[in-house]
């Protein structure tokens, strides 16, 4: 393992001047929600400090709402409604400064998106319209000119409080179609006829005023960052990067100290790896550097230092922005700096981090189990307590749980033996990563195997199925069983509590093992009571092989839980484009030879369908050894 940085990466560690402040390198942890915020401030503070310890030159808050009319309950964000919020925000600044990084704050008012469920204030926005989040039966009122002046005053007060808390940078946010400035900018939400509506110049007026007034309030004591979505991804119905998006940047080009550019809305900006590759936003934002002299940052789930360097050298960005990669590996910058790129814990793009935030819970990460537990459990992504004994340990099963256990115990110094029945490690991760567009999920396996293979005291044995007697004979002091689970084939799941008559369906395990419905090109119904990704990827696979696929689910839509991972509508669009029929609110009630019966859960109407069944419902643990 090299301890010398590849000189190709030196450019990533050059300081960057951003107005009156200087970032120590080109790594910018952009604002990202995390489900901690004001409800769990100690957890939030420790998590942000960990990013700074790991080498991120700029570390920012999540969105920080600055007035009760922008209350975002039930989401857990930071807030700056009054001076009472200063202590925990100042503590975050101290945690970031301790490691020499710049601390930034993103001031946000969600306007017509937020229902003000806690504050009970009337939401505000450019127009009279219902609030958008959760379809609450709450109406936002159109802002008068006096309201706009009040809003600007509230924002200025928040900027001054941010300076009082010690922040180095303030982010003025007009992105994700989720803030008052972005609502004024969008033709979809602003059809005013006064000086704040109509032309692009008018719709951009409020954002210009906020940037100018932020600069006036803080002078040269803090940097001003414009976080701006250049494309609403609506085609000609919205802002487009080659049209008004570019014109807006040109109008404001030299006003901020830095541009942080992206696309709207959040589920386009943070697309999963199933739908977007690393650096996918470059086609939308690459023009920005040509129209401003100020530093430009953008995101794109960058995990490869080669891709980062390329983006800088090609003149796409000056600063690498990242949210999810900084969650998966808070020490990504330091690993590159120390010549340890092979140790990077690469983001797999599953968006479980976003899901937990959307569930109003502290974020977690598939790759980084310490995320969200830096304070409560004192977990550190790179440090772990040394072993407490000389016990030998046998782990049965080299799936993701077995690999993680072996890695953690190996780091502690234990002698570990890992036995796997199959001819390859990784378990479900290996198998699922071969399904359509899930290849990056294999990073869960690859990172752990890469670390373990450099540990002489951790041994892996493949094709080594063990029974209880063999485990006893092995003689390890401690045994951990990580033998996983198998999908049920009888239809039992969340909504069906007893086996479906006649159901001996194929399962995802069968499909991943190469089994198929008997006749190529025949009809197959995938019954989904899991409501996440699996049924849809099985549907994609079988449709690509020529089967006539129907996806039936008791949910109100396909892959309903994927709303939390920001990909439900992407999934549904892909299935429809593949010619897959979707039947929502349908329950599997009987299966026969070459046919199945579905019942509409609202009307009770029964329909018979030809073909075979794939059941994606629930799993049972492989507990033979317990």
Model-derived regions: residue spans:
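A conserved short coil-to-beta-strand element within the FAD-binding core of flavoproteins
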Residues: 461-474, 584-595
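Rossmann-like dinucleotide-binding cores of NAD(P)H-dependent redox enzymes
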Residues: 415-454, 530-586
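Hydrophobic, well-ordered secondary-structure elements that form the walls
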Residues: 259, 288, 311, 323, ...
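Rossmann-like dinucleotide/flavin-binding elements
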Residues: 387-418, 461-472, 483-498, 502-563, ...
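Short acidic loop-to-helix transition motifs that present clustered carboxylates
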Residues: 303-306, 327, 465-468, 511-514, ...
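Flavin-dependent oxidoreductase catalytic cores
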Residues: 1-396, 400, 404-416, 424, ...
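A short helix-to-beta-strand connector/capping loop
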Residues: 316, 452-460, 498-504, 575-581
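Conserved acidic residues
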Residues: 57, 168, 257, 318, ...
């Amino acid at each position: 393992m090299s301890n010398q940085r590849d000189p190709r990466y030196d450019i990533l560690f050059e300081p960057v001047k951003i107005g009156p402040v200087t970032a120590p390198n080109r790594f910018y942890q952009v604002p990202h929600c995390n489900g901690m915020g004001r409800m769990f401030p100690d957890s939030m503070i420790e998590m942000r400090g960990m990013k700074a310890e790991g080498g991120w030159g700029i570390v920012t808050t999540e969105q920080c709402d600055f007035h009760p009319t922008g209350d975002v309950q039930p989401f857990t964000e930071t807030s700056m409604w009054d001076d009472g919020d200063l202590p925990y925000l100042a503590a975050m600044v101290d945690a970031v400064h301790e490691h020499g990084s710049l601390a930034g704050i993103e001031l946000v008012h969600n306007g017509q998106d937020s229902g003000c469920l806690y504050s009970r204030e009337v939401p505000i926005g450019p127009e009279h319209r219902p609030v958008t989040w959760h379809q609450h039966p709450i109406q936002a009122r159109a802002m008068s000119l006096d309201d706009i002046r009040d809003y600007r005053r509230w924002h200025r007060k928040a900027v001054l409080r941010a300076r009082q808390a010690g922040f180095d940078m303030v982010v003025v946010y007009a992105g994700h179609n989720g803030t008052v400035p972005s609502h004024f900018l969008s033709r979809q939400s602003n059809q005013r006829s006064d000086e704040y509506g109509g032309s692009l110049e008018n719709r951009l007026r409020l954002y210009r005023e906020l940037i100018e007034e932020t600069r006036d309030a803080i002078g040269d004591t803090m940097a001003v960052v414009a976080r701006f979505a250049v494309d609403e991804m609506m085609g000609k119905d919205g802002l487009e990067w080659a049209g008004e998006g570019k014109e807006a940047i040109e109008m404001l080009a030299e006003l901020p100290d830095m541009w942080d550019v992206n696309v709207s809305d959040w589920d386009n900006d943070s697309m999963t790896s199933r739908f977007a590759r690393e650096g996918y936003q470059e086609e939308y934002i690459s023009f920005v550097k040509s129209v401003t002299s100020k530093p430009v940052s953008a995101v794109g789930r960058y995990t490869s230092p080669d891709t980062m360097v390329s983006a800088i050298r090609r003149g796409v960005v000056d600063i690498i922005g990242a949210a999810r990669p900084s969650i998966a590996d808070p020490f990504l910058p330091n690993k590159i700096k120390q010549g340890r790129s092979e140790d990077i814990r690469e983001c797999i793009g599953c968006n479980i981090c976003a899901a937990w935030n959307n569930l109003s819970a502290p974020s977690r990460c598939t790759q980084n189990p310490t995320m969200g537990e830096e304070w409560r459990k004192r977990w550190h992504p790179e440090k772990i307590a040394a072993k407490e004994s000389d016990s030998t340990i046998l782990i049965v099963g080299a799936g993701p749980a077995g690999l993680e256990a072996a890695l953690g115990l190996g780091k502690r110094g234990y002698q570990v033996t890992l036995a796997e029945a199959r001819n390859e490690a990784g378990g479900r991760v290996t198998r699922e990563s071969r399904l359509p567009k899930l290849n990056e999920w294999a990073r869960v396996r690859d990172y752990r195997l890469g670390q373990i293979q450099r540990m002489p005291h951790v041994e892996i044995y493949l094709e080594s199925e063990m029974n209880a007697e063999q485990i006893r004979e092995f003689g390890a002091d401690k045994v951990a069983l990580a033998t996983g689970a198998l999908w049920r084939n009888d239809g039992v799941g969340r909504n069906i509590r007893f086996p479906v008559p006649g159901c001996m369906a194929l399962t995802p395990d069968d499909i991943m093992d190469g089994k198929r419905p008997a006749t190529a090109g025949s009809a197959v119904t995938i019954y989904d009571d899991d409501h996440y990704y699996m049924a849809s990827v099985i549907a994609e696979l079988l449709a690509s092989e020529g089967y006539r696929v129907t996806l039936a689910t008791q949910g109100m839509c396909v892959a309903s839980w994927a709303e939390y991972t920001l990909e439900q509508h992407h999934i549904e669009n892909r299935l429809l484009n593949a010619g897959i029929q979707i039947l929502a609110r349908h329950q599997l009630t009987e299966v026969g030879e070459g046919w199945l019966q579905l019942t509409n859960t609202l009307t009770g109407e029964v329909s018979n369908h030809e073909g075979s069944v794939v059941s994606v419902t629930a799993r049972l643990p492989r507990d033979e050894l317990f």
